[in-house]
Amino acid sequence: MLYPTQARAEWVVNHPSDGPMELDYKKRETLERWTWCDALYMAPPVYVKLYVLTGDKRFIKFMNKEYKATYDLLFDKDERLFYRDSRYLTQKEANGAKIFWGRGNGWVLGGLAEMLQDFPKKDKNRKFYEDLFVTLSERAAKLQSPDGFWHASMLDPASYPSPETSATGFIVYA
């Protein structure tokens, strides 16, 4: 399993997409980038692990570049949460709050938990990810419902009143 994964990751690193970061399902090139927050669970831990296994700095360099591009677009510094993707940057919930998906932010926290297990302790970028993990964890903790769950909408629990078990699972895992 390692060799096909490594071969694909090497191809991606050697042929980085110059597609836009704004998600548009009609444009294939936007799916080549980490244009939705869920991708921060799917890809970065793999690139960190490949760096650890091979020592090839291209993997961690690529991961840092793509992660920060996603962070720059989707992380709201005021709310300290990630938008699901660029389509949500201007949308609001019924209560007027910005839309931040519980599951999406859970994906990010889960990805950070996985990455930080292997991320080199002396790497200059480690502090960015540690700080982000703490920031996002503290914010998520404040948004937990009294019943112990999180909701699909982190700032408008009434919009989806049922508990969001996948968000809760990811956040608790992290």
PLM ranges: what are they?
Residues 1-174:
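Glycan-recognition and catalytic cores of secretory/periplasmic carbohydrate-active enzymes
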